[in-house]
Amino acid sequence: MPAPDPAPVRPALGIQGPVVAFHDPWAGDASDAVMRTGTGIPIPSQDPPPTPAQFVAALGDLGADFYVHHVLPTHEDPTAMVRDLTAGGIDVVLGNEYGNINGPYAEGTNRYDVPADTLRAAAASGRLVGVLYDEPEHLQIHADQYRRDAHLPHFGQTEGLGADEAIAVIDTTVHEIVGRVDAAVAGGGGARVPVLSEQVFPVMFHTLARAGMTPAPKVMKESFQPLQLGTALGAARQYDRELWICADLWGPDIGPWLTRAPGFPGHSPAEFASALRLAHLFAPTRLFVENIDVLVRHRGEGRFETTEHGEVWREFVTDFVPRHPLRWSHRDARADIALVHADDSDFGRGQRPFGNRAATAPETSRSVFAAWHALSHGQLPATGSCLHIPGYDFPRHRLNAIPRSEFPLAEGATEPTRLHGLFQATRGVLVFDEHVRADQLTDAGLIVVAGSRLPAATLAALRTRADAGATVLVASWLCDAAHARTERVGSGRWVVYGSLDEADALDALSAHLGPADVWTQRFGDHELRIRPASPGGETLDFEIADAAPRPLR
């Protein structure tokens, strides 16, 4: 792998713009002429509109280094916004969410691309630091989420295609998108910026990173944190990308806090505090919160009142981050356990793989869930990789009957619900796709191989790691005849399984899993140890320790 970059003292910190609290300060009344949330229900602005200067001052007061601005398709000229942000010393990320929801769309897709002229103008200021694609994996799989007139997946049509053919379609489109962004930014005289894949589902991270996008996982939301972060971090390491993290406050829970919409915020202030600390300690390039709506209330005339969640953010920015300078980068991440599997875009429902309505994901793709279940001491479900699977009923749905005109609510419930937590015990699990090389797996003492397909070259690379001392636990359906037998090879083990509850598989796992009450992740010579600080893992405790040396070569 490439040599790690020097560790930053901290990630750059950002805030995403308003979606229900008040108007976009530069678009004004036009903000309410489009839908700014993915709920499918128009929600009028709830607070008086701040002026651009007042809004930029509020961003500065909250400690924002950058602002995530989703472009309103009716107001694509960023000149005034960039001028005001520059005056406040704040960088900008341009996103495509509002266009995805409302159109216009790139031909033959449900995707809005920020126009080249908009990118050039922002780049000319020197303040553009990224271009964000909002939940592109979601909109590839669920192509009719917003656009209902035809089935047109985000990166292109995949009807009737197998996984490799569908990935080729996506790969071609992403290369074109990244190329267009690069050309527009260069045309404005700016330095190259990452094109972000901000994701809710823990699928397609590797597919999109391989094609040129930068992983930007959402924490909190409806995610399982070790699985979400282990997958995105593995993709960033395998494909040498930056890692951005979005602390997304939309979620399943309700409680005694200001509530702008059902499930917004859907995480308690205490959970938010732990999630921010977790994200910081994973040392991303940049970290931002979605959205400003739940950090402040605007009372008019530029008077912003910080909410309980806003006070959590302020404490994080002004106290926790300065007291915890980072001695590592996400590029220093090392796997104690590597999980290798191909991408079938299956998070548990098995439907519409890569947007193909005529197919379902292969049954063998579900072995990935079984692997995570085993690697987490049974704490992650064996049936899916996020909360959007059968068995989870979101408390936020209790608020759906309340007219949106009655929001914001002083509280969503008198007692908090706790469907979502932050903790499952895993031991340094990073995910790599089926194209991983042997030299990218040198730190892993255990390599678990699952999923639906595996190239012969990767099978040979895995055998090389077993020869060098690793235990390779590989699914029988992925092995050719020459590798279909459990045996000792070199100084390691090659263990073939049909099910992870077989005796040989359990033996291989037990030697590497670690304690059932600690989640760990190594970064170079440092080990981050995470423990639940409350029932259900709503809050976390953190410890930084020296990482034990690894004998593998």
Task: Map each language-model feature to its residues.
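C-terminal beta-strand-rich structural cap/linker in extracellular carbohydrate-active enzymes
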Residues: L473, E538-R553
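An acidic, glycine-rich "communication" segment
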Residues: A482-G537
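Glycine-centered, small-residue-biased loops immediately flanking beta-strands
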Residues: A470
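Glycan-processing catalytic domains of CAZymes
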Residues: M1-G451, A456-A461, A466, S476-G498
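Residues that cap or initiate secondary-structure elements
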Residues: K221, S345, P535-G536, A548
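Intrinsic disorder/low-complexity signal
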Residues: P4, Y133, T486, A516, ...
